[in-house]
From Swiss-Prot:
Organism of this sequence: Orientia tsutsugamushi (strain Boryong) (Rickettsia tsutsugamushi)
Cysteine pairs bridged by disulfides in the record: none
Protein's cellular compartments: Cytoplasm
Organism lineage: Bacteria, Pseudomonadati, Pseudomonadota, Alphaproteobacteria, Rickettsiales
Single GO biological process annotation from the record: regulation of DNA-templated transcription
Protein name: Probable transcriptional regulatory protein OTBS_0251
Amino acid sequence: MAGHSKFKNIQHRKGAQDKKKAKLFASLIREISLSAKSGTDIQYNHRLRAAISAAKFNNLPKDRIEKAIAQANNKDNYENYFEITYEGIIFDGIAIIVEALTDNTNRTAANVRAIFSKYGGNLVGTGNASFLFDRLGIIKFESKASTSEKLFDAAIEIGAEDIELDEEYNVVYTPIKLFTNIIEELAQLFGYPVESYIGWRPRNTVLISDTEKAQKLIKLVNALDDDDDVQRFFGNYEFSEQIYNNSLT
């Protein structure tokens, strides 16, 4: 029985990983096709170049990238998709901004609203959560010990607002008006980033110190992550390592 149980757990984890990968690939393909509608020359279409870079980093096969670009020429593909932003508040002043790409705004709004409601939060009007964030460019490079300090110096010199260095990614934050120029200049020195987009950064963060609340928040963000229409979400929360680990048990 123990072996059977372990096998079932492995199957469950693999199934969850496969589902997450499928959603990621679908999201990458959708972004490539939408970006390519503005032109397929990546020299002039920086959103498309960013989408392709993200796709390559996440191992989306080359033929699927090419097919996604070709789909942009079909007027029936993604013609009725809308980019929608939702703002939500949970407990303790925690705010989350959700960015979605959808062909059915009623469905997506209902799904996102239901997720917040289930875990003790609610959607709020435009500006009621986003005032806690700054809107800026976000550029992610793979973290490499040999280039991190050089990246930091170069980014600050050409106008970046801030840069965060960690074991997985080096994240450069830029004013929106300098976003494209900074990508191009850094790319000449360090190669193209693994991901780049206009996003949200919290001005201050709320430290979650209660295990029960942490569990509820983790379930909420996992539910958002599982929703096919949700592209990205940004929150003003952080966990201590102990609380986060306790919340997973």
